[in-house]
């Protein structure tokens, strides 16, 4: 496969520049006959989750296609689902560059992107043009300049706009790169947010005559007692699923490596065991009451199987896709 050569060229570039170059090419082929250049045939492995049928259990995690610009090209590679975003009500530039760093030896990434995106209206226009036949998840967040105590309003604005076009909606309250965002995972703040989201979901179900499931994306840095409280809140508010996990602030597995002390969330292989353990604890606590989408350091069939064995119904990749490329999709879907 050609990807090792592509990767070698891309890894000569700054990580964000490499992403821009890749997306320039993908934008050229998405929705055109040139999609055949990136198309991969993968076997059907249907899975039902959150009331939806996924053609296979492997999805692309949020963060790669923040604005939904390359949905069809990415879909052609064989993903059963694609999660676009995180998107916010208004466009925002994100944090200052440089803001993403490769830990090549560890096959990890540290990012402090800060929800850079073109805004929810732009994303919706892109989604309208897409023809992806898998499940499209839309991951939503709050603007950086929205006070945390008013954060719920941003989620409800985004829900209203993406609801007609989403297969499911992911609520990102676990990015470490938006000040105060992770506080929404705790206690009354979480209950208030989930209550508002559930009410809005039922209101939009009536309006559009279709039910779009909602999943909450959580951090891997929650303590066991905090995880129990989160699980309890998700069940009480009849949330449809949980995505475990986002990036970690923990650097214990990358000490001494170049860029290890950069501020931001760590993803990739160093997150693998930590996220799997969160899934295992969450699964024991939920006891089948709502499904788990497993993400964090999946870079092989074995790593994907470990997430499923720990209790995940579906899995997603991001950093593994950067390091291994499209062949990883085919490998996981074929052998999982």
UniProtKB/Swiss-Prot annotation:
Main localisation: membrane
GO terms for biological process, alphabetical: 'de novo' pyrimidine nucleobase biosynthetic process; 'de novo' UMP biosynthetic process
Requisite cofactors: FMN
Pathway(s) where this gene product acts: Pyrimidine metabolism; UMP biosynthesis via de novo pathway; orotate from (S)-dihydroorotate (quinone route): step 1/1
Gene3D superfamilies recorded: Aldolase class I
Self-association state and partner proteins as the record states: Monomer.
Name of the featured protein: Dihydroorotate dehydrogenase (quinone)
